[in-house]
Curated annotation (Swiss-Prot):
This is Ribonuclease 3. Digests double-stranded RNA. Involved in the processing of primary rRNA transcript to yield the immediate precursors to the large and small rRNAs (23S and 16S). Processes some mRNAs, and tRNAs when they are encoded in the rRNA operon. Processes pre-crRNA and tracrRNA of type II CRISPR loci if present in the organism. The lineage of its organism: Bacteria, Bacillati, Bacillota, Bacilli, Bacillales. Its main location: cytoplasm. Residues 172-241 form the DRBM domain. The active site is at D63, E135. The keyword tRNA processing applies. Belongs to the ribonuclease III family. It comes from Staphylococcus epidermidis (strain ATCC 35984 / DSM 28319 / BCRC 17069 / CCUG 31568 / BM 3577 / RP62A).
Length: 245
């Protein structure tokens, strides 16, 4: 019964994925690689698959590929901007809210393979899950087709938003807080994961932001990255409210 359900889900994914790539004008060779890119850990757990078959390794790779691609784009587009400005712009483009915008533009969340529990609790519309799948897809595209194809994809899905300044409202609180700290000569900012709880398909992470060896705020999120953003947001708001850090 379980194997039949898995086969049906995989078959449905392969059909949808093939149609999606065709609509994007992209070619692919290894569909198994892309299946992994869209396999959430809850899907892997539901069908007792190898834990390394979920998309987190590809997410790790895709994150780096995105940073490189966006860095090259900004480097070429803004030849007179200093490194600090380019870094800030890149952070806005590759932060979670922006990745969700890109993913939703092409409805990538429709492709994500989820476990039953994650599906029921709204995982398909969860921002952290969508952004992770987007990064994993980029990682898979890089391995399967190379950096030139990733660039082509970015030209269609990412760069138009940047050129139209449609990401102005997206806030990367880690960058905001870092810039404030730097302007005040307050020392180094680090983040530390202090708690991880809940079942594998519905994890909750708690991180704290540390300034000059002192924890100044905490944040919770469905991923470590999200919890760090929430912690930075709290710290930044404390600063805006003129409370001592």
């Amino acid at each position: 019964m379980a194997n039949q359900k898995k086969k049906e889900m995989v078959h449905d994914f392969q059909q949808k994925f093939t149609d999606k790539m065709k609509s994007l004008g992209l070619h692919f060779k290894n569909i198994d690689l892309y299946q992994q890119a869209f396999s959430h850990s809850s899907f892997i757990n539901d069908f007792n698959m190898n834990r390394l078959e979920h998309n987190e390794r590809l997410e790790f790779l895709g994150d780096a590929v995105l940073e490189l691609t966006v860095s090259r784009y900004l480097f070429d587009r803004h030849p007179h901007l200093p490194e600090g400005n380019l870094t800030k712009m890149r952070a806005t483009i590759v932060c979670e809210p922006s990745l969700v915008i890109f993913a939703n533009k092409i409805k990538l969340n429709e492709l994500i393979l989820l476990g039953k529990g994650e599906e029921k609790t709204g995982g398909r519309t969860r921002p952290s899950l969508i952004s992770d799948a987007f990064e994993a897809f980029v990682g898979a595209l890089y391995l399967d087709q190379g950096l030139d194809t990733v660039w082509t994809f970015a030209e269609k899905v990412i760069f138009p938003y940047v050129e139209d300044d449609e990401l102005v409202g997206v806030v990367d609180f880690k960058t905001q807080f870092q810039e404030y700290v730097h302007s005040q000569n307050k020392g180094d900012v680090t983040y530390q994961l202090i708690k991880e709880e809940g079942p594998a398909h519905h994890r909750l992470f708690t991180s704290e932001v540390i300034l000059e060896n002192k924890a100044v705020a905490e944040g919770k999120g469905k991923t470590k990255k999200e919890s760090e953003q929430k912690a930075a947001e709290q710290a930044y708001k404390l600063m805006k409210n003129k409370k001592s850090l």
